[in-house]
Each structure stands twice: as structure tokens, then as C-alpha cells.
């Protein structure tokens, strides 16, 4: 199951040239770029681990791509995403994110149904990747 989170998630994986184009766009907008990774892609897991520090002062897309490749070699079986942060007053938020690396096997999610009092059914989803495997060894 292919995880669809962030910008471009329904498109085929981006090439390095396409990633560089997106990085240049982010830098031209004045956004700070960061790299994050995780092995738990649950949709509500919005707090991924930072790979290094956010690149507030970096203005070269090639340098950011070098850091992306370092993250790929360090965490080849994790999801890696690029985030672009807009520090403009009244925005001050991530305005763009896209996945630049994913594991070869994406196990997907299972739907959990739980009966509650009054014939109420509560639904939740769990990642197959986190079942019976600790963080860091899920892929």
C-alpha cells in the first residue's frame, strides 16, 4: 500500500531533478527547508524526527539535495520527507511537504473496530509496520 501524505503524494516518486526544482521553488519563496524521517507513517503521526537542523540560512538547492541523500543513506528503509516552513507573520507554518524516500515494502494499515456501550462502534487504524516491532526495526 503506497502511503499518500503531502504534496505530490499521488504522483510517481520524484526524481532528484524534480526534487531540486521543488527545492529551488521553496528557496525562491523564502521558505526554510527541513528534512524529517520516520518508520511510523500513521496519518496522525505529524511529528517526524528531524534529520539535522532546519536549513534556515541555506540558499542552495544542491546543498539541500546533498543532505537528502545523506538522510537516504542513513535511513534507507524509512520514510523521508522535505518540509518547507514559511516564517511570514500570520503564516508561521509548514506550507509544503513531500516524501522523497520510502521503504521498498509499505505494509499499509488495518482497520480496528471496537464496540462501545449503546451499540456504538469506534473505528481506528493501525499501521502493520508497528505491530510487534519496536521503533527503528519496523522495515
Swiss-Prot record:
GO biological-process terms attached to the record: reductive pentose-phosphate cycle
A GO term, aspect molecular function: ribulose-bisphosphate carboxylase activity
CDD domains: RuBisCO_small (cd03527)
SUPFAM superfamilies attached to this UniProt entry: RuBisCO, small subunit
Pfam families: RuBisCO_small (PF00101)
Superkingdom of the source species: Bacteria
Gene3D superfamilies per record: Ribulose bisphosphate carboxylase, small subunit
Keyword Transmembrane tagged: no
Stored InterPro entries: RuBisCO_ssu (IPR024681), RuBisCO_ssu_dom (IPR000894), RuBisCO_ssu_sf (IPR036385)
Assigned keywords, A-Z: Calvin cycle, Carbon dioxide fixation, Plasmid
Family the UniProt entry places it in: Belongs to the RuBisCO small chain family.
Role noted for this protein: RuBisCO catalyzes two reactions: the carboxylation of D-ribulose 1,5-bisphosphate, the primary event in carbon dioxide fixation, as well as the oxidative fragmentation of the pentose substrate. Both reactions occur simultaneously and in competition at the same active site. Although the small subunit is not catalytic it is essential for maximal activity.
Other comment: The basic functional RuBisCO is composed of a large chain homodimer in a 'head-to-tail' conformation. In form I RuBisCO this homodimer is arranged in a barrel-like tetramer with the small subunits forming a tetrameric 'cap' on each end of the 'barrel'.
Record text on subunit structure and interactions: Heterohexadecamer of 8 large and 8 small subunits.
Protein name: Ribulose bisphosphate carboxylase small subunit, plasmid
Organism: Cupriavidus necator (strain ATCC 17699 / DSM 428 / KCTC 22496 / NCIMB 10442 / H16 / Stanier 337)
Amino acid at each position: 500500500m503506497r502511503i499518500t501524505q503531502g504534496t505530490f503524494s499521488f504522483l510517481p516518486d520524484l526524481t532528484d531533478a524534480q526534487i531540486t526544482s521543488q527545492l529551488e521553488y521553496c528557496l525562491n519563496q523564502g521558505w526554510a527547508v527541513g528534512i524529517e524521517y520516520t518508520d511510523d507513517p500513521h496519518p496522525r503521526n505529524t511529528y517526524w524526527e528531524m534529520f539535522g537542523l532546519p536549513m534556515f540560512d541555506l540558499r542552495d538547492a544542491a546543498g539541500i539535495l546533498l543532505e537528502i541523500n545523506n538522510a537516504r543513506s542513513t535511513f534507507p528503509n524509512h520514510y523521508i520527507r522535505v518540509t518547507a516552513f514559511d516564517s511570514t507573520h500570520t503564516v508561521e507554518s509548514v506550507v509544503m511537504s513531500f516524501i522523497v524516500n520510502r521503504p521498498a515494502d509499505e505494509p499499509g494499515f488495518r482497520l480496528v473496530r471496537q464496540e462501545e456501550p449503546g451499540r456504538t462502534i469506534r473505528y481506528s487504524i493501525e499501521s502493520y509496520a508497528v505491530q510487534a516491532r519496536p521503533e527503528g526495526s519496523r522495515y
